[in-house]
């Protein structure tokens, strides 16, 4: 008989907090929740506050709130004025000096929402890592979520950091994002950027893979049953697979001549395509922040300038980009007092 004599170790504060954070509850908190919940709450709350009450008159010369007559598609939390540079515009900083109304007027809510939103997304990614570790599964969900994080950080933070000020970032609103897309096209020819092309291929390719995969699984479900839909035929305790990979493989082998024969490779490919698209788009946006150019077909531009009868879709788009720049520069930066005489506005062969 062995008798073990020991002393109970006192549990430290860290262990007590760790137990409380990881307690089984309806909404898991965890250590990641200490970052996620406050930042996400403040970002969403700041956005609702801005779109409801705060004007963009002092930063953009625009109405941007429900209070001023905007609707869900036209309301926005707009970026600070160009004169603010890259200031964080803290409420207690030299710009607002603790005046909340003044802080809202000069665009403080935008930096508030952008920074808290970025940390909220990072917190959600860490939440997926934390729960995956506790449950005992691989962290591919968190790895996949790095794609949206890279897009948010590159578009809302890195791009304006490479430009003159936060003013050139997108404002947080539907129509505001559309304006930003037109800006990227006019000033950077974004649609002809190879990183944008890879991003489009990744996102649309991921959507296509998702649709094909869902349809194929529905087509090859076991035990359909007599119900109007196939969902009730599934039971969590059934011993066999939900669908037939062999049948799906045979179907697509007949369609294309090739098919995925391995579920792991199939699902990794479905993960890889859209996430790679998001990352390549983010890399492209960082390139735009540094004013890297897209494809230039100068020979076509020179020939179009010399020959009135020669024009391509590329040269037409270049002229449209010039029109966007001429219009947006004066509209977006009224403090610069840009004046464009009629003779310098773009007039192409077909415009």
UniProtKB/Swiss-Prot annotation:
Top-rank EC class of the record's enzyme: oxidoreductase
UniProt: pheophytin a binding residues: 128, 141
GO biological processes: photosynthetic electron transport in photosystem II
Keyword Electron transport tagged: yes
Gene: psbD1
Alphabetical UniProt keywords: Chlorophyll, Chloroplast, Chromophore, Electron transport, Iron, Magnesium, Membrane, Metal-binding, Oxidoreductase, Photosynthesis, Photosystem II, Plastid, Thylakoid, Transmembrane, Transmembrane helix, Transport
Compartment(s): Plastid, Chloroplast thylakoid membrane
Transmembrane segments: 39-59, 123-139, 151-164, 206-226, 277-293
Alphabetized Pfam families for the sequence: Photo_RC
GO cellular component: a single term: chloroplast thylakoid membrane
Residue sites binding Fe cation per the record: 213, 267
Extra remark beyond the main annotation: 2 of the reaction center chlorophylls (ChlD1 and ChlD2) are entirely coordinated by water.
Positions bound to chlorophyll a ChlzD2: 116
CDD domains, sorted: Photosystem-II_D2
Residues annotated as binding chlorophyll a PD2: 196
Topology of the protein relative to the lipid bilayer: Multi-pass membrane protein
Enzyme Commission number: 1.10.3.9
Protein name, as recorded: Photosystem II D2 protein
Chain positions recorded as a plastoquinone binding sites: 213, 260
Keyword Transmembrane helix assigned: yes
Molecular function in Gene Ontology: chlorophyll binding; electron transporter, transferring electrons within the cyclic electron transport pathway of photosynthesis activity; iron ion binding; oxidoreductase activity
Purpose of the protein: Photosystem II (PSII) is a light-driven water:plastoquinone oxidoreductase that uses light energy to abstract electrons from H(2)O, generating O(2) and a proton gradient subsequently used for ATP formation. It consists of a core antenna complex that captures photons, and an electron transfer chain that converts photonic excitation into a charge separation. The D1/D2 (PsbA/PsbD) reaction center heterodimer binds P680, the primary electron donor of PSII as well as several subsequent electron acceptors. D2 is needed for assembly of a stable PSII complex.
Family, as annotated: Belongs to the reaction center PufL/M/PsbA/D family.
Record note on quaternary structure: PSII is composed of 1 copy each of membrane proteins PsbA, PsbB, PsbC, PsbD, PsbE, PsbF, PsbH, PsbI, PsbJ, PsbK, PsbL, PsbM, PsbT, PsbX, PsbY, PsbZ, Psb30/Ycf12, at least 3 peripheral proteins of the oxygen-evolving complex and a large number of cofactors. It forms dimeric complexes.
The reaction(s) this protein catalyses: 2 a plastoquinone + 4 hnu + 2 H2O = 2 a plastoquinol + O2
Cofactor binding note from Swiss-Prot or TrEMBL: The D1/D2 heterodimer binds P680, chlorophylls that are the primary electron donor of PSII, and subsequent electron acceptors. It shares a non-heme iron and each subunit binds pheophytin, quinone, additional chlorophylls, carotenoids and lipids. There is also a Cl(-1) ion associated with D1 and D2, which is required for oxygen evolution. The PSII complex binds additional chlorophylls, carotenoids and specific lipids.
């Amino acid at each position: 008989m062995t008798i073990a004599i020991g002393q109970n170790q006192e549990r430290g504060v860290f262990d007590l907090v760790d137990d409380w954070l990881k307690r089984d509850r309806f909404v898991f908190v965890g250590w990641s929740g200490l970052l996620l919940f406050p930042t996400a709450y403040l970002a969403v709350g700041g956005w609702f506050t801005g779109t409801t009450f705060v004007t963009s008159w002092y930063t953009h010369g625009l109405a941007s709130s429900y209070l001023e007559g905007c609707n869900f598609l036209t309301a926005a939390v707009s970026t600070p004025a160009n004169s603010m540079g890259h200031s964080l515009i803290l409420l207690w900083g030299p710009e607002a000096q603790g005046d909340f109304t003044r802080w809202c007027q000069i665009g403080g809510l935008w930096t508030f929402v952008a920074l808290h939103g970025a940390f909220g997304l990072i917190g959600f990614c860490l939440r997926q890592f934390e729960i995956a570790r506790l449950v005992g599964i691989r962290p591919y969900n968190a790895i996949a979520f790095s794609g949206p994080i890279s897009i948010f950080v590159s578009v809302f933070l890195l791009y304006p950091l490479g430009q003159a000020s936060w003013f050139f970032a997108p404002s947080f609103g539907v129509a505001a994002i559309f304006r930003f897309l037109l800006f990227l096209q006019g000033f950077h020819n974004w649609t002809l950027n190879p990183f944008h092309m890879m991003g489009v291929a990744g996102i649309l390719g991921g959507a296509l893979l998702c649709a094909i995969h869902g349809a194929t699984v529905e087509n090859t479900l076991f035990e359909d049953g007599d119900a109007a839909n196939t969902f009730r035929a599934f039971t969590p305790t059934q011993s066999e697979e939900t669908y037939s990979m062999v049948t799906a493989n045979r179907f697509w082998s007949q369609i294309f001549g090739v098919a995925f024969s391995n579920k792991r490779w199939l699902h990794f490919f479905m993960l890889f395509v859209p996430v790679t698209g998001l990352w390549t788009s983010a890399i492209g946006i960082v390139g735009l922040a540094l004013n890297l150019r897209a494809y230039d077909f100068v020979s076509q531009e020179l020939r179009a300038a010399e020959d009135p009868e020669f024009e391509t879709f590329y040269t037409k788009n270049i002229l449209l980009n010039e029109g966007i720049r001429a219009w947006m520069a004066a509209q977006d930066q009224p403090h610069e007092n840009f004046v464009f005489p009629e003779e310098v506005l773009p007039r192409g062969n077909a415009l």
